[in-house]
């Protein structure tokens, strides 16, 4: 039966459905334009670029100061599918620099809180939260679907794992980090640019690298680093990434920006020899819950000698430390845990039986 519209116009049912669908498309287009209008008029983005973002998937590994800011920017830019992976919970010390969280989020999983806030910020996108430790057993399954991966981690072990996954599966990713008043960013395109291990062949010995917990961090630098990293991720998604390999270093206190050329290592074990040792189960850290002791032992897979006296000097500013030439004992006055660290990197974390909590403590105070 024909439908009679205003002004006496007749329309068949099939034509009516077409009109409804057309009207829906117009409304949807208006909605998208209203949300993304400032990006759509950019010659670097435009309608084709915005469509590409909406059909893209990005995973953010780590939801600390850098990762949460990158996630926020990607969601508001309209990346269609986001996945955030983080094993930790929101702590009071996070609020100084992790702008996605507030006091009402304390003790909640970071990935869960972040995903809920991003859904409220942009209901047009899909956001997945994975409250897990990224490790060699799950990394390929978790990261394998992404078009781009953004680094928001706090330790080199996980970064080397991400580098292995991305190189093996040819997934572009953006390495970044911030500590003190400076940060660095390097976009990595498998088969095009050097990989992370061309730049850093091996994980530095435990206790050598600075961490935010030991060196501090000015809350402005993670936001700047995340903005640069997110821009690099968007360029990759749009096929407009730079083809020359570069490491971007920014010091927010001195207001200096450097770009360093990174050269591919012709003997790189990862991107040249295809040795993905951080995906090798035989080479992963050994983590053991100690029976009857309310403690977890962590034995690093890679041998190294920790400078206990130097690390003790750093830890002394934030807790109680005792050390000799063989061991270091550290007590955090704000928590119940106690860490005994040995020269070879082995540690016993007392006050928890949770392997993930122990790994988090180890990564925080014994930088890797």
Question: For the regions a protein language model found, what residue spans apply to each?
Answer:
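Adenine nucleotide-associated cytosolic modules
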Residues: 2-7, 11-368
């Amino acid at each position: 039966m024909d439908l009679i519209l205003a002004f006496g116009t007749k329309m068949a049912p099939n034509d009516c459905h077409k009109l409804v669908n057309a009207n829906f498309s117009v409304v949807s287009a208006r909605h998208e334009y209203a949300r993304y209008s400032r990006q759509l008029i950019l010659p670097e983005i435009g309608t084709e670029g915005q469509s590409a973002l909406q059909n893209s998937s990005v995973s953010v590994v780590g939801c600390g100061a850098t990762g949460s800011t990158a996630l926020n920017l990607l969601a508001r830019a309209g990346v269609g599918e986001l996945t955030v992976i983080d094993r930790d919970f929101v702590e009071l010390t996070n609020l100084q620099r992790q702008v996605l969280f507030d006091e009402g989020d304390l003790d909640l999983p970071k990935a869960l809180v972040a995903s809920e806030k991003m859904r409220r910020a942009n209901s047009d996108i899909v956001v997945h939260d994975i409250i897990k430790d990224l490790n060699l057993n799950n990394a390929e399954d978790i990261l394998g679907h992404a078009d781009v991966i953004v680094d928001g981690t706090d330790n080199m072990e996980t970064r080397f794992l991400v580098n292995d996954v991305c190189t093996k599966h040819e997934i572009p990713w953006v390495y970044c980090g911030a500590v003190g008043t400076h940060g660095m960013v390097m976009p990595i395109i498998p088969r095009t640019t050097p990989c992370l291990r061309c730049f850093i062949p091996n994980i530095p010995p435990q206790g050598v690298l600075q961490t935010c917990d030991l060196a501090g961090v000015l809350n402005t630098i993670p936001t700047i680093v995340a903005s640069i990293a997110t821009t690099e991720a968007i360029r990759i998604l749009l096929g407009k990434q730079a083809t020359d390999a570069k490491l971007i270093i920014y010091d927010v206190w001195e207001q200096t920006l450097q770009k360093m050329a990174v050269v591919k290592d012709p003997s790189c074990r990862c991107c040249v020899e295809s040795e993905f040792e951080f995906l090798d189960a035989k080479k992963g850290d050994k983590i053991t819950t100690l029976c009857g002791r309310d403690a977890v032992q962590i034995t690093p897979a890679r041998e190294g000698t920790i400078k206990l006296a130097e690390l003790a000097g750093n830890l002394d500013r934030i807790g109680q430390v005792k050390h000799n030439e063989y061991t270091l004992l550290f007590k955090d006055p704000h928590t119940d845990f106690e860490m005994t660290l040995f020269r070879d990197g082995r540690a016993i974390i007392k006050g928890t039986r949770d392997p993930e909590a122990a790994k988090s403590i180890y990564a925080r105070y014994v930088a890797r």
